[in-house]
Amino acid sequence: MTAAQRLLTVNGERIAFVAGIRTPFAKQATDFHGIPAVDLGKMVVQELVNKTGIDGDWVEQLVFGQVVQMPEAPNIAREIVLGTSLPVGTDAYSVSRACATSFQSAVNIAEAMVAGHIRGGIAGGADSSSVLPIGVSKRMARALVDLNKAKTLGQRFSILKRLGFKDLLPVPPAVAEYSTGLSMGQTAEQMAKTHNISREDQDELTVRSHQKAHAAWEAGWLSDEVMTAYPEPYKKHLSRDNNIRGDSQIEKLAKLKPVFDRKHGSVTAANSTPLTDGASAVMMMTESRAKELGLPVLGYLRSYAFAALQVEEDMLMGPSYSTPVALDRAGMSLNDLDLIDMHEAFAAQTLANMKMFASDKFAQEKLGRDKAIGEIDMDKFNVLGGSIAYGHPFAATGTRMITQTLNELRRRGGGVGLTTACAAGGLGAAMIVETE
């Protein structure tokens, strides 16, 4: 077990979250069709600065992430600085940790504060599944390089003769793991079968997610953390997530066919997160800097942990590996938590992780621990719904979850919450936050 640690700056201050905001999340090729991630990122960071009313000079660093990267803007963080009111001298760099990317960006800001390098910064992430880097085949790519080097017409003709019709076809971004060739959906199917996750249980979690997210919107609980977006060419706006289905019903979901194993599978388009466009960001400061600027504090970062695991099987079990470490570092148990927010990449993955939280066998064989961290209290779990309902712009989900959890804790009068996510490549993230 990891010993409890106090996450403090060199001056003994806590790391504070002072504000968080996100765009509405939109399904692929809908309201944000044609809007690149960098523009979504600019939109949300500018809104965050406007919301706090601070001078941009107080933002000493911007760490931002993008999973589906565009070759023309490889450092999305720097492009955001150059495209907003932040001073041109603002330090900015980009990170990527698949679906845990904005957890990583928030941790990087926190670590810079712990080291005493900065007292305030912005972390976040953005992704667009509607604006994708469509590539070319490997043979075509090599031919293009050779053509650029060729000096005569004959040399160029010789290079072109090597290409067949298939070599000319565009190549969409890969959906499979580079190391295994398995897609996330195939891994979710494997986890459902291995851990006996039924189709009915997956669909029930899906309906729960949509109904709770719909109820949260109807109650007005999300309106302060979701901006109204006016994407170019500014002819329309979006103020709510467009994937949430408040009328979702088990009977309707039961009619859908499996996607990844059509004969024996249970993972459908409905009980999986859809491809999504969106951006989110949080502003973080030391306690003293927030006080100097007169900014209210949403909450504090108590602890965090990342995990890496095998990719051939149970690749999306990251929360079950990272959460125990985050709890140990916070000096807490699962029962001490008031809220638990777990990223719902797939209902199957979510339910499998929930099982492993309570499995002594898993704890002993996989984690080297004496016993499991415990059974999840469903009254604390994803109380506002999860990614199945909201959608999942890969790099934006982490800071969406952090802001949402902090606001919900404050609405309930304070407490401690866990946010945790799986990520491609066999990665996991867990972060414990608290409010007063």
Curated annotation (Swiss-Prot):
Heterotetramer of two alpha chains (FadJ) and two beta chains (FadI). Belongs to the thiolase-like superfamily. Thiolase family. HAMAP family: FadI. The gene is fadI. It catalyses: an acyl-CoA + acetyl-CoA = a 3-oxoacyl-CoA + CoA. SUPFAM superfamilies: Thiolase-like. InterPro entries: 3-ketoacyl-CoA_Thiolase, Ac-CoA_C-AcTrfase_FadI, Thiolase, Thiolase-like, Thiolase_AS, Thiolase_C, Thiolase_CS, Thiolase_N. It is an enzyme of class 2 (transferase). Keywords: Acyltransferase, Cytoplasm, Fatty acid metabolism, Lipid degradation, Lipid metabolism, Transferase. This is 3-ketoacyl-CoA thiolase. It comes from Idiomarina loihiensis (strain ATCC BAA-735 / DSM 15497 / L2-TR). Catalyzes the final step of fatty acid oxidation in which acetyl-CoA is released and the CoA ester of a fatty acid two carbons shorter is formed. It is found in: Cytoplasm. GO terms for cellular component: cytosol. Transmembrane segments: none annotated. Pathway: Lipid metabolism; fatty acid beta-oxidation. The active site is at C99 (acyl-thioester intermediate), H392 (proton acceptor), C422 (proton acceptor).
